[in-house]
Regions:
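Positively charged n-region of N-terminal signal peptides that target proteins for export
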Residues: 1-7
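Sequence/structural signature of beta-propeller domains
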Residues: 46-58
Length: 238
């Protein structure tokens, strides 16, 4: 029995090492994740963990393209610099860990991988670059759910028409260096184009009971855009 436990421990260690082999992070990042998870474990079980972790990450410098730092796609864990998407992704990964009583850095990495990539496959073309694609995939996994519905306040419909990445490949370092990836990105854009999402027009938002009952603390909010080829301009947490 002792030998079996020892083998099991070694196997688990090897699995953890393998999981982190494709990750890109510093010791500061892993220490911060562990500290945040420890803080989360001390909160009441019915706490709003999205809001708790969102507040804990407020103030981190906003830096764009923090995922574009390697010649080969790797799972980037960077809690020293965030953009709007990585902010939401890290908050969600921390929340899922705490809700499911997962307490290790490897657990966090696993959730972040599943959140960021379709089917958890760490590959540039599997990364959920367009946020409407991100919404659909994370809804499928049960990590989030959409609150859009017909009628007020979701009175308008967005028909997605994406193509910005393939038309502006030179703006994306990993596409510019690997033009062979364009075909797969174009296919993702084709599948996403035509999908419809209901939304709340900005001009209609007021401080009323309708909106207060619709948008709750901790909800993930996506701001759509009219910019050609894109679906959203910004995301955040209410």
């Amino acid at each position: 029995m002792k030998t079996m436990r020892k083998i099991l421990t070694i196997l688990l260690l090897l699995l953890a090492v393998h999981a982190n082999a494709t990750a890109d992070y510093t010791r500061e990042d892993s220490v911060k994740v562990m500290r945040l998870l420890e803080e989360g474990q001390k909160q009441p079980r019915n706490a709003n963990f999205i809001l708790f972790y969102a507040r804990r990450l407020v103030g981190i410098p906003y830096i764009a393209q923090t995922l574009e730092v390697n010649s080969r796609e790797r799972l980037v864990i960077n809690l020293r610099q965030l953009d709007c998407t990585t902010y939401v992704e890290n908050v969600l990964a921390l929340t899922l860990c705490t809700q499911n009583r997962k307490t290790t850095f490897a657990d966090f990495c696993n959730y972040l991988r599943l959140i960021r990539y379709e089917d958890g496959k760490i590959d540039y073309t599997s990364r959920l670059h367009y946020f409407t694609d991100w919404i659909a995939d994370n809804t499928r996994l049960g990590f989030v759910y959409e609150i859009q519905r017909s009628g007020a306040p979701f009175t308008q419909v967005q028909t997605v028409r994406v193509g910005y990445m393939t038309r502006h490949a030179a703006d994306y370092p990993m596409l510019k260096a690997h033009p062979e990836r364009l075909k797969a990105i174009a296919e993702r854009e084709r599948k996403l184009t035509g999908k419809q999402f209901r939304y709340i027009p900005k001009v209609q938002i007021t401080n009323s009971s309708l909106y207060r009952n619709t948008i709750k603390d901790g909800d993930i909010i996506a701001i759509i855009t009219a910019k050609k080829g894109l679906d959203t301009s910004h995301i955040g947490i209410a």
